[in-house]
């Protein structure tokens, strides 16, 4: 139950990041610089925690560790951030959140390919897992492509984009193909990182060391890209505005605090369990977007959200049943082993007593 509560809280935190990023993107911020600052702040925040609280879990720095950290940093930090924000600039906050719904399907397919997930279609749990994952993907399609009538659920609105440079233009523009591909590419990279964490997460040390290494590599890559693409040093100046808030929030809270929590859920429940909570994030972003970002809420959005949430609960039920079944099987095997040892011990005792 702790992992369920943790992942629901993660979706609220991610939803806040979506809204802040949308406001920042529409304000004309240099996105490469924003990403570089985000991952740098995350590294600066997490590294002292790793040194203080997980000193004994510090991994041995070998060439293998550096290679794993580099791959983890690319898939989990650099590539998703480099693709995601420009993709959001070409779409909307709601669509960007909706696109993450395909993550369970991507993770399930890749998990089956790499034999990290099981799908026993002969069992009720296996069939339900497949149906739940497909429901999430179908709900996302309904959410994006079926509009229906516009729903007005708020009696008043707060327009957070009113003071932005490009607020009205970007809020009402059509979703571009390039933006869709960039956002989807970000989700694919994140799914690969989730599977990588399930496989080699323990080799990167404790959760704090794992996060520090990933963000450190990601920040180094993003800083190099930002410096090579833009030589205007004024773009690197941070003021007391929404850009600083978005950078600190996404860097310290999301990349710093949330990533270790997600890594813990991956280690205890598996990568598919983590991804199926994405629809909750979409519902939150859609509600906030309709209230504060002037993004209209349609009937199709509500229907799609209900379908996706149903898929989430179905997959969570399957994972809980699988864990209970695995625990029961393990206890049964252990009991049989103990009984067998007891029988052998009794037989040995009888043999000694026979003259």
Swiss-Prot record:
Q: How does it sit in the membrane?
A: Multi-pass membrane protein
Subcellular localization is given as: Membrane
Where do transmembrane segments lie in this chain?
4-24, 33-53, 65-85, 94-114, 134-154, 175-195, 207-227, 244-264, 272-292, 297-317
Against Pfam families, the record matches this protein to: EamA
| UniProt keyword Repeat present | yes
Q: InterPro entries from the entry?
A: EamA_dom, WAT1-related
Q: Name one GO molecular function term.
A: transmembrane transporter activity
Q: Which UniProt keywords apply?
A: Membrane, Repeat, Transmembrane, Transmembrane helix
Q: Where is the EamA domain?
A: 12-142, 210-316
GO cellular component terms listed in the entry, alphabetical order = membrane
As for family, the record states: Belongs to the drug/metabolite transporter (DMT) superfamily. Plant drug/metabolite exporter (P-DME) (TC 2.A.7.4) family.
**Protein's recorded name:** WAT1-related protein At1g25270
Species whose genome carries this gene = Arabidopsis thaliana (Mouse-ear cress)
């Amino acid at each position: 139950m702790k992992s369920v509560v943790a992942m629901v809280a993660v979706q609220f935190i991610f939803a806040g990041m979506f809204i802040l990023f949308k406001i920042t993107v529409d304000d004309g911020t240099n996105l490469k610089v924003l990403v570089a600052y985000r991952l740098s702040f995350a590294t600066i925040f997490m590294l002292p925690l790793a040194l203080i609280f997980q000193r004994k879990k510090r991994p041995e720095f070998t060439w293998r560790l550096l290679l794993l950290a580099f791959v983890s940093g690319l898939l989990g930090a650099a590539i998703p951030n480099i693709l995601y924000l420009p993709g959001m600039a070409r779409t909307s906050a709601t669509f960007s959140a909706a696109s993450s719904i395909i993550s369970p399907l991507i993770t399930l397919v890749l998990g089956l390919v790499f034999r990290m997930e099981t799908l026993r279609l002969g069992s009720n749990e296996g069939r339900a897992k497949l149906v739940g994952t497909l429901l999430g993907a179908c709900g996302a399609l309904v959410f994006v492509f079926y509009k229906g009538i516009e729903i007005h659920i708020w009696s008043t609105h707060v327009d957070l984009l009113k003071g932005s440079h490009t607020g009205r233009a970007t809020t009402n523009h059509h979703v571009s193909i390039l933006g869709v591909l960039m956002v989807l590419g970000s989700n694919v990279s994140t799914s690969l990182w989730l599977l990588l964490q399930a496989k080699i997460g323990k080799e990167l040390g404790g959760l704090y060391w794992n996060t520090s290494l990933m963000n450190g590599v990601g920040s180094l890559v993003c800083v190099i890209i930002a410096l090579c693409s833009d030589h205007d040093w004024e773009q690197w100046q941070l003021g007391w505005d929404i850009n600083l808030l978005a950078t600190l929030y996404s860097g310290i809270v999301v990349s710093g605090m949330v990533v270790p929590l997600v890594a813990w859920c991956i280690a205890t429940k598996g990568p598919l369990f983590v991804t199926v909570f994405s629809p909750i994030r979409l519902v939150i972003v859609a509600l906030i977007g309709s209230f504060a970002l002037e993004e209209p809420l349609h009937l199709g959005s509500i229907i799609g959200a209900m379908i996706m949430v149903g898929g989430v609960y179905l997959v969570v039920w399957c994972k809980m049943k699988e864990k209970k079944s695995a625990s029961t099987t393990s206890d049964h095997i252990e009991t049989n082993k103990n009984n067998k040892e007891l029988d052998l011990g009794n037989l040995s005792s009888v043999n000694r007593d026979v003259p």
